[in-house]
């Protein structure tokens, strides 16, 4: 990282170089936008992508946090808009005959496709292909799609951007009636990205709206369709839980501090497992953990653990924002008593152990199997003591 970098990402510990590309498929709201992290070949020329893709995301982030969109958006853009990810932008994909396991990742409220880059980079360095979906249900800080400007079909020069802002709950609206349709749309978007990547791995042509990106044909034969997991944070955690039930190709789900509220009550008898709930100390409620326990009671391989000293945003990249000015906008909600780098390491190891077990990986991640049971640094099984009488 350069001296001016105001986001200091955790060091990568896996053996693979990491590539990264953006994929937009389709010319309508029903299409897909995601950021793909993957093992790549070493390359002498290595352009690094921006962490926050464009200025509009800085404005959207300020708006989501309920700051002045214009001025604080400008401040965010100046402070963190030039930060780059330590990966190879559109780096050459490293083919693997047996295929890489695939993870589809769903962001939380106010997130976007790069909000969990620390997790994505580390998992890609460990030999996973990770697709971070940018949802179009208006839960993202900002997002967009490219649509034709006229009735003519598809030349790139005839496309125009349509931006979708974050949608707030209006006065008098019942939040569940907004969030429940959103979580179902989110699942459809996750499944669509799964299908796109399976098509690419099968050698089918996938047209990327973005020019000059990674040729997805290079993924041919390199994704293991039998080893697929879904993962998400907060609203994305609920999305992952629902996606596991609705799409049988997902073999397991990882729910980081899942916000269970959007899921309808009659969903729980139908819920599938295994789900790995990784909570932080001070976000969950008794009711929310009770709902997680309903799923665990039905599926003996599902687990709940809590990371002590971590807070809700400890599981996002915003935990790694540094510098007095910008960090103030996140510090009250993104800094727990546990060092964010220690928190990240503990969670990654727990995730790897869970994935090894349930995707039948031939790795050494079982050295952290105890983490799945809440036995490890800063971990406890189940809920914190003040929620333990459930």
Swiss-Prot record:
Catalytic activity: a 1-O-alkyl-2-acetyl-sn-glycero-3-phosphocholine + H2O = a 1-O-alkyl-sn-glycero-3-phosphocholine + acetate + H(+); a 1-O-alkyl-2-acyl-sn-glycero-3-phosphocholine + H2O = a 1-O-alkyl-sn-glycero-3-phosphocholine + a fatty acid + H(+); 1-O-hexadecyl-2-acetyl-sn-glycero-3-phosphocholine + H2O = 1-O-hexadecyl-sn-glycero-3-phosphocholine + acetate + H(+); 1-O-hexadecyl-2-acetyl-sn-glycero-3-phosphocholine + a 1-O-(1Z-alkenyl)-sn-glycero-3-phosphoethanolamine = 1-O-(1Z-alkenyl)-2-acetyl-sn-glycero-3-phosphoethanolamine + 1-O-hexadecyl-sn-glycero-3-phosphocholine
Primary localisation category: cytoplasm
GO cellular component, one term: cytoplasm
This protein's UniProt keywords: Cytoplasm, Endoplasmic reticulum, Hydrolase, Lipid degradation, Lipid metabolism, Lipoprotein, Membrane, Myristate, Transferase
Lipid anchor positions (N-myristoyl glycine): 2
EC code(s) of this entry: 3.1.1.47, 2.3.1.149
Subcellular location as annotated: Cytoplasm; Membrane; Endoplasmic reticulum membrane
Gene Ontology biological process terms, A to Z: lipid catabolic process
UniProt keyword annotation of Glycoprotein present: no
Example of a GO MF term: platelet-activating factor acetyltransferase activity
Active site: 234, 257, 312
The protein's role, per its UniProt record: Catalyzes the hydrolyze of the acetyl group at the sn-2 position of platelet-activating factor (PAF) and its analogs, leading to their inactivation. Hydrolyzes propionyl and butyroyl moieties approximately half as effectively as PAF. Also catalyzes transacetylation of the acetyl group from platelet-activating factor (PAF) to lysoplasmalogen and to sphingosine, producing plasmalogen analogs of PAF and N-acetylsphingosine (C2-ceramide) respectively. Has a marked selectivity for phospholipids with short acyl chains at the sn-2 position.
Name used for this protein in its record: Platelet-activating factor acetylhydrolase 2, cytoplasmic
């Amino acid at each position: 990282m350069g001296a001016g970098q105001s986001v200091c990402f955790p060091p990568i510990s896996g053996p693979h170089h990491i590539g990264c590309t953006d994929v937009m498929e389709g010319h309508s709201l029903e299409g897909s936008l995601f950021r793909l992290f993957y093992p790549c070949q070493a390359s002498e020329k290595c352009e690094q992508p921006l962490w926050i893709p464009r200025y509009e995301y800085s404005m959207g982030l300020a708006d989501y946090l309920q700051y002045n969109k214009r001025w604080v958006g400008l401040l965010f853009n100046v402070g963190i808009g030039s930060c780059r990810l330590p990966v190879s932008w559109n780096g050459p994909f490293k083919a693997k005959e047996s295929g890489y396991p695939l993870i589809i990742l769903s962001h939380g409220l106010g997130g976007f496709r790069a909000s969990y880059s620390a997790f994505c980079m580390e998992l890609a360095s460990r030999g996973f292909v990770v697709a971070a979906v940018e949802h179009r249900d208006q839960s993202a800080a900002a997002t967009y799609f490219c649509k034709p400007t006229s009735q003519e079909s598809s030349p790139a020069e005839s496309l125009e951007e349509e931006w979708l802002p974050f949608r707030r709950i209006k006065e008098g609206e019942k939040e569940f009636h907004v969030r429940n349709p959103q979580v179902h749309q989110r699942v459809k978007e996750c499944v669509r990205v799964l299908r796109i990547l399976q098509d690419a791995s099968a050698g089918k042509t996938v047209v990327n709206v973005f020019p000059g990106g990674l040729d997805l044909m290079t993924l041919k034969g390199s994704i293991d369709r039998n080893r697929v997991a879904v993962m998400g944070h907060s609203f994305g955690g609920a999305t992952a839980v629902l996606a596991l039930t609705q799409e049988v190709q997902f073999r397991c789900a990882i729910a980081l501090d899942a916000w269970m509220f959007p899921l309808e009550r009659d969903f729980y008898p139908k819920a599938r497992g295994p789900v790995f709930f990784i909570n932080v100390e001070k976000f969950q409620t008794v009711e929310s953990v009770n709902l997680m326990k309903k799923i665990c009671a039905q599926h003996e391989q599902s687990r709940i653990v809590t990371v002590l000293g971590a807070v809700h945003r400890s599981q996002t990249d915003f935990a790694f924002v540094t510098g007095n000015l910008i960090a103030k906008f996140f510090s009250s909600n993104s800094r727990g008593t546990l060092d964010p780098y220690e928190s990240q390491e503990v969670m990654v190891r727990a995730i790897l152990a869970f994935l090894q077990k349930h995707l039948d990986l031939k790795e050494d991640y079982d050295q952290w199997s105890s983490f799945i049971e809440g036995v490890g640094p800063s971990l406890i099984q189940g809920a914190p003591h003040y929620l333990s009488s459930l």
